[in-house]
Amino acid sequence: MALSGSTPAPSWEEDECLDYYGMLSLHRMFEVVGGQLTECELELLAFLLDEAPGAPGGLARARSGLELLLELERRGQCDESNLRLLSQLLRVLARHDLLPHLARKRRRPVSPERYSYGNPSSSSKRTEDSCRRRRQASSSSDSPQSQWDTGSPPTKRQRRSRGRPSSGARQRRRAGLAASQQHQQHQELGRPSSEGKVTCDIRLRVRAEYCEHGPALEQGVASRRPQALARQLDVFGQATAVLRSRDLGSVVCDIKFSELSYLDAFWGDYLSGALLQALRGVFLTEALREAVGREAVRLLVSVDEADYEAGRRRLLLMEEEGGRRGTEAS
């Protein structure tokens, strides 16, 4: 007999459940990853997978990355509980930027809209004044004993005579402490204000690579071993060596931002492609073009979205604190 007051639990569709937890379905992840694979990378993946022992072949007919990944799913080589093969293939292609998508966690969209800041000079002035006040307070609150201990290195300290020091020695010590304290305050005030600014680090990755690897692999990869497994391992090793020899290098650098307007301008240029266009003249030099010959070369630029979000929150908090201090001071 069913209870009259009980209600059945609501049944959720798979898409609603994934949206609630901020996850991507397997096929949606295939669309995201496969849509960012180039034709050259598709040819390389099809070549490696078709050479596997017992592989039925036919991956070379895949017209897109989505079709190739769906074919792997139909063969049972890739599913929701086993993405190991896909992870290994992306590492072989040196596409480490696509590995975070395998977690199937939906990334939050970041708006390129900029924050209204007011006068940048006034905000920097407030930051300098607040940092200067903090340094003065910290220097004045230090104990004389700690300043005396750190005022001169241990090797230069003179041995004190046993017994109580004389009044003249105590007066000279007080005068030395006062002079060292004043000198330290003048040094702190004379330092540049950039040391006290709140900054955030944004990691920029720049990589140059060939647009096509297919012709080089066809010329440099071949195996005559009779056994299928040995031939597959031989081909895989040769392909890895060829790709490593064609690595044009990459640059990873951390850029410091102390102004929110500059950070948002940098992010807006990254989203619009202006940053990529500006870096092409820096990295794709004439010497590099002469080294690669007639082959086409492209430049890949990546900025971590999590770094931008964390840095924006940090600088925005600094702007709000500076405005609050300015209001209280007035």
Swiss-Prot record:
GO biological process, one term: positive regulation of extrinsic apoptotic signaling pathway
GO molecular function annotations of the record: DNA binding
Motif (Bipartite nuclear localization signal): 156-174
The DED domain, residue ranges: 25-104
Tissue expression notes: Expression is high in liver, heart, kidney, and testis but low in brain, spleen, lung, and skeleton muscle.
Biased composition regions of type Low complexity, renumbered to the chain: 137-147
Residue ranges of the region described as Disordered: 104-195
Chief subcellular location: nucleus
Record keyword Transcription regulation present: yes
Keyword Transcription in record: yes
UniProt xrefs under SMART domains: DED
Listed PROSITE patterns: DED
One Gene Ontology CC term in the entry: nucleoplasm
Motif stretch (Nuclear localization signal): 104-109
Keyword list, A-Z: Apoptosis, DNA-binding, Nucleus, Transcription, Transcription regulation
Location of the protein in the cell: Nucleus, Nucleolus
Its biological purpose: May play a critical role in death receptor-induced apoptosis and may target CASP8 and CASP10 to the nucleus. May regulate degradation of intermediate filaments during apoptosis. May play a role in the general transcription machinery in the nucleus and might be an important regulator of the activity of GTF3C3.
Assembly and interaction partners: Interacts with CASP8, CASP10 and GTF3C3. Homodimerizes and heterodimerizes with DEDD.
Entry protein name: DNA-binding death effector domain-containing protein 2
Gene that encodes the chain: Dedd2
